[in-house]
Each structure stands twice: as C-alpha cells, then as structure tokens.
Amino acid sequence: MAATRRILALQNGHCILVAHSYGGAVITEAGTDPSVAGLVYVAAHMPDAGENEADDGKRFPSDLSKSDAIKRTADGFTYFNPAQFHEYFAADLTAVQAAFMARSQILNAADNFKAVITTPAWRSKPSWMVVAARDRTINPDLEADRERWYAQRAHSHTVEVTGASHSVYVLHSKEVADVIESAARAVSK
C-alpha cells in the first residue's frame, strides 16, 4: 500500500490504477487517493470494507486453494511451487513461458493476504474488471464465481476473456490494454 501511495504522490494530475491478482486489494485501498480517477482489476481481488483476500478465498475456494501449490518460506513469504505454476497460474501459456514466469516470480508476504480493507475505492470511483474465464487461481467458475461476483457487487464494467488463465495479460494483452484504454477514455470525459 505504501509503495502505491508513494507513486501516487509523484503524479501530476489524475490517473488510473491497474492491478492483477492480489494487487486488486492494494488498489482497492490506495485508490481512495484524490488523484485516482478509476480502477482496473485484471483477474484481481476486489474486497469490500472489513474483508481481506484470505477470507474471500475461503468463501470462494479456487482450484489453487484446494491444492498444495502455494509454498511458504520460513520467514513468512509465499510463492508458487514452480512445478505447479503452469497448471494453476498460466495454463494457457506454453511450458517454456510458464517456466520462465515461475522462475521469475516475486515472493509475497503471507500477511498481505490478511490485510483488511477499510475504505474500498470502487465504492466511490468507476471500476473495470477483466475476468479470466479459465482462472484457477481466483475462481471465476459459476459455482464460486468470485471474479464475476466482485465485478457485479462493484457495478464494474466487465470484460470476460474466454479461455484465459490467471496470467490473462500475457496471451490476451490486447484485450487487457483495450480495457485500460477504455477506462482512461471514460474518466477523461
């Protein structure tokens, strides 16, 4: 959160925050900054006040949450088991692409998933959601429907990308860029 707020302080004028995955919680909280004109969630979490990603994950379990693919370091950081990265994070990519992403992943502090949202920006600002229809990390399926549920609750402009995995921004970069451009145009009117 602090890193995003530092960057916002450096901006000259309005901006749009874009986030993927757990970054959605970050822009949900940081997006209340007056310089933020809109929010774009790309296969991302979108918690409400009093919620956090860990609890939302229990309410809407994904294939990932039912697996042992997430590993934890002794000092409290989490990462994808590289052997399972392709299956759960990047199923629509080639094995070579997924292996590269697995080797270059950034570890995340496990406590980040427990950060409780106080004031969700999507309640007062326009938002867009890119739903990755074959996401196994954040469940978009009809039985759990988390990405779609988030978007409906926030009244987000929603674009669903058929066949896309959690790493929707790789193979479907044009669709993701189009949503970001659409958001920028909408808030600049």
List the predicted regions and their residue ranges.
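Conserved strand-to-loop "acid loop" that flanks and positions the catalytic carboxylate
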Residues: 39, 128-135
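Flexible "cap/lid" loop of the alpha/beta hydrolase fold
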Residues: 32-82, 86, 109-113, 138, ...
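Active-site nucleophile elbow and catalytic-triad environment of alpha/beta-hydrolase enzymes
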Residues: 103-121
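Catalytic His-Asp charge-relay segment
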Residues: 124-131, 158
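Conserved acidic catalytic loop of the alpha/beta-hydrolase fold
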Residues: 1-15
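Gly/Ala-rich beta-loop-alpha elbow adjacent to hydrolase catalytic centers
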Residues: 18-23, 27
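Glycine-rich phosphate-binding loop signature in dinucleotide/nucleotide-binding domains
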Residues: 10-13, 183-188
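Conserved loop-alpha-helix segment in the C-terminal half of the alpha/beta-hydrolase fold
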Residues: 133-170, 182-183
